[in-house]
């Protein structure tokens, strides 16, 4: 049977290499290094909160407010607001694509009675009747859709800030209208958006659409007293394309210095590349249901040039504040459904942990100042096909969010071998076009980025930016600051084990029961158990050895030798003619039941306590006394074998821990029975006990004396189909005595027949056992 794997683990002898022992001890210990150079050693942060000082400007980072620029004519890029500062009455700007869009904005000063004024627009002299009875400036948006038509006033903006804005985005032209400080946006459609050019007659600024909230603030409230713009005086727009060469954005500055320590400021331009990770889990059954589509942390390593220096960088991307959605197409097994799929929206955050191999990250322990500035990036989702067995496949596609820099902190990210002191960049989100939908379902036009295909076929997303930090380092550059609590490879192994446990637990839904029963009948030895792993034969042998070394420290292995000796003692000292106290004393050598029982009665409490304790060790007795039936360990080993074959994360380092955990944790709620003539006595690990007749399944009183007599000699049988299931099966379907006896003995052929007949009661019981195989 499949439980041969556990017996083999318990009985096989093996040699222990001293090198392996040293390696194992080294991987399990965490070394603590304590230093006390100054008050800085008392915390990871400095004792005071100083400012970060100067953060040098850099053309790497796109400014929020770029300008001011001199009046000019050009074709503005899409997705950028043009913020125009009108300083006189008259024409502010003219914009056209010479096909279906002509618009001009004229400024009217306050307190103007109705009057006809001449304006030169697109080389033509036009007369408009204008007026303004308010204390604010009025901006009239004059529009026509053809060169043959006359202009008319399409929108009006009443403003005391004297700013107007225009944006090309999404096939439309957007402008502001209404009255400040509550002016809002509106749009006009056009069939030729890309060819729209603009002639501006005043100073203007350029703002990315990702910073539209700032543009709205400037329109309604004006610019702040001191604005961080690229220029001090208006420059020609051509200066925007000049490649600034400033060495100071990547520099090392000594802030202060003593004999042993110095404060260093590092300024760096960085390129952050990251990708989203996801997990898609399909339910068992007919293949129409999905249980989970979720985000997972994802690592990415890459190289890039910074001031001629080749930099190796490592990022880890994770999300926080996900929104759980679901779709239920109906109650039938063939109705498409998703129990849960995650979507990131405005209330979510994206974290990107960044590390590179430059000096800036070498001694990142005592940091007293940290600041950063990053560009925004748009992430657009792709398509994912739900491959159902019959019918047109539902397809989840679309969805988009824009990431905006929201802060930076220190962090630690884990690779397969080391841990890295990193910078965690936090991004807030805004939803963007297009929305996402699930084709062929009722789910349409929802906003956010679902986890089904967040990378949309892209290898990575990229953000440019810069950071500046100051920290305390040794004066001698050859020294490295000791980390107060060093992180060893063991923590990386724990992270791998955590991921593997999650994967193992999710695979329970994908195990077919008929295949499981067939697999449980095979004698799974060490080699066949691990042969499904993608590895060579030599590696398989090595993995088997590693598993045995780990398994010898398990609870099952440490108790088997004690149990073997105690069983023989119990059998020799058992007497059929003494009191129940004597019988329980005989078995107490391996059950520890009667140690604290001075006067055993037939009360339910005493029986329950005793049977609960005994049942915990029935597994050991069953393992050394083979029966012709199937055991819980057969199912455990079969599930373990199936999951090992299906796993994508199993490895030499993680397999020993997983096998050991499975031996101890798979199927925690077990029931065992002892059979005598036509009566069955059944107990479980929860302390419940039953006694019943095979023919009728009628319960009879549980005779603790009889149970005590049988427990040392009779074979212990796994109650795979427990009493409640048998009772339910007999009441609803009716079963013969032969069928009942075979089910009581956990006969594998009988189990397979019921499963092949799709008997819902038996299938449900086996499914419950599979779902108990979790770590």
Swiss-Prot record:
Find motif (DGE motif) and give its ranges. 307-309
Task: Name the InterPro entries on file.
Answer: ConA-like_dom_sf, Rota_A_VP4, Rota_VP4_MID, Rota_VP4_MID_sf, VP4_concanavalin-like, VP4_helical
Instruction: Supply one GO BP term.
Output: permeabilization of host organelle membrane involved in viral entry into host cell
Q: What are the residue positions of the site described as Cleavage?
A: 230-231, 240-241, 246-247
- Where is the segment annotated Spike body and stalk (antigen domain)? 247-478
State what this protein does: VP8* Forms the head of the spikes and mediates the recognition of specific host cell surface glycans. It is the viral hemagglutinin and an important target of neutralizing antibodies. In sialic acid-dependent strains, VP8* binds to host cell sialic acid, most probably a ganglioside, providing the initial contact. In some other strains, VP8* mediates the attachment to histo-blood group antigens (HBGAs) for viral entry.
This chain's protein is named Outer capsid protein VP4
Q: Which organism is it from?
A: Rotavirus A (strain RVA/Human/United States/Wa/1974/G1P1A[8]) (RV-A)
């Amino acid at each position: 049977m499949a439980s041969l794997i556990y017996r083999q683990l318990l009985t096989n002898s093996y040699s222990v290499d001293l090198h392996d022992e040293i390696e194992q001890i080294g991987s399990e210990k965490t070394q603590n290094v304590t230093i006390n150079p100054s008050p800085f050693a008392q915390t990871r942060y400095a004792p005071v909160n100083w400012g970060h000082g100067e953060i040098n400007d850099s053309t790497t980072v796109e400014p929020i407010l770029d300008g001011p620029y001199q009046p000019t004519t050009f074709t503005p890029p899409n997705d950028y607001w043009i913020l125009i500062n009108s300083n006189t009455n008259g024409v502010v700007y003219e914009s056209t694509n010479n096909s279906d869009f002509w618009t001009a904005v004229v400024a009217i000063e306050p307190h103007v009675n109705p009057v006809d004024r001449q304006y030169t627009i697109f080389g033509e002299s036009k007369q408009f009747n204008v007026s303004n009875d308010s204390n604010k400036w009025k901006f009239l948006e004059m529009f026509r859709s053809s060169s043959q038509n006359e202009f008319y006033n399409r929108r009006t903006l009443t403003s005391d800030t004297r700013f107007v804005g225009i944006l090309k985005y999404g096939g439309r032209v957007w402008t502001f209208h209404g009255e400040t400080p509550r002016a809002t946006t509106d749009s006009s459609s056009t069939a030729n958006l890309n060819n729209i050019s603009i002639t501006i007659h005043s100073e203007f600024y350029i703002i990315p659409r990702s910073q539209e909230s700032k543009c709205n603030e400037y329109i309604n409230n004006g610019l702040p007293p001191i604005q961080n713009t690229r220029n001090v005086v208006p420059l020609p727009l051509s200066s925007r394309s000049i490649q600034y060469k400033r060495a100071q954005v990547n520099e090392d500055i000594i802030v202060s210095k003593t004999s042993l320590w110095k404060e260093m400021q590092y300024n760096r331009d960085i390129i952050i590349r990251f990708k989203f990770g996801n997990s898609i889990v399909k339910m068992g059954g007919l293949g129409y249901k999905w249980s989970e589509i979720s985000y997972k942390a994802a690592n990415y390593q890459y190289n890039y040039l910074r001031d001629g220096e080749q930099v190796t960088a490592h990022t880890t991307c994770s999300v926080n504040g996900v929104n759980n959605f679901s779709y239920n197409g109906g109650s039938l097994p063939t109705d498409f459904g998703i129990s849960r799929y995650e979507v990131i929206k405005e209330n979510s955050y994206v974290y990107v942990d960044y590390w590179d191999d430059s000096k800036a990250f070498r001694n990142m322990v005592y940091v007293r100042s940290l600041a950063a500035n990053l560009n925004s990036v748009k992430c657009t989702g792709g398509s994912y096909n739900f491959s159902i067995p019959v019918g047109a496949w539902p397809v989840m596609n679309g969805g988009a969010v824009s990431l905006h820099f929201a802060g930076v902190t220190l962090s630690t990210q884990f690779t397969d071998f080391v841990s890295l002191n990193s910078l965690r960049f936090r991004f807030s989100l805004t939803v963007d076009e297009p929305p996402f939908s699930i084709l062929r379902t009722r789910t349409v036009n929802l906003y956010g980025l679902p986890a089904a295909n967040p990378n949309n076929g892209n290898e990575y997303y990229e953000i440019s930016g810069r950071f500046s930090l100051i920290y305390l380092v040794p004066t001698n550059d050859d020294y490295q600051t000791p980390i107060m609590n060093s992180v060893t490879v063991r923590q990386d192994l724990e992270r791998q084990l955590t991921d593997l446990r999650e994967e193992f637990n999710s695979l329970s839904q994908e195990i077919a029961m008929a295949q499981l029963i067939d697999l449980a009948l095979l004698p799974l030895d060490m080699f066949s158990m691990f042969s499904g792993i993608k590895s060579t034969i030599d590696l398989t042998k090595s993995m088997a050895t590693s598993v045995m070394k780990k398994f010898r420290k398990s609870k099952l292995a440490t108790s088997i030798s004690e149990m073997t000796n105690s069983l023989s003692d119990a059998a020799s000292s058992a007497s059929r003619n003494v009191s129940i106290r004597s019988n329980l004393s005989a078995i107490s050598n391996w059950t520890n039941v009667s140690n604290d029982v001075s006067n055993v009665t037939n009360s339910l409490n005493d029986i329950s306590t005793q049977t609960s304790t005994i049942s915990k060790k029935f597994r050991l007795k069953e393992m050394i006394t083979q029966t012709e039936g199937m055991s819980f360990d057969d199912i455990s080993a079969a599930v373990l074998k199936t999951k090992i074959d299906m796993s994508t994360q199993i490895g030499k380092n993680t397999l020993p821990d997983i096998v050991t955990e499975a031996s101890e944790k798979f199927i925690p709620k077990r029931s065992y029975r002892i059979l005598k003539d036509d009566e069955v006595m059944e107990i479980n690990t929860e302390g419940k006990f039953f006694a019943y007749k095979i023919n009728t399944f009628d319960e009879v009183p549980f005779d603790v004396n009889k149970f005590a007599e049988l427990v040392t000699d009779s074979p212990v049988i796994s109650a795979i189909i427990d009493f409640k299931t048998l009772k339910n099966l007999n009441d609803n379907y009716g079963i013969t005595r032969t069928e009942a006896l075979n089910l009581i003995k956990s006969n594998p052929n009988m189990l397979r027949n019921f499963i092949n007949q799709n008997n819902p009661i038996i299938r449900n019981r086996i499914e419950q056992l599979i779902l108990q195989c979790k770590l």
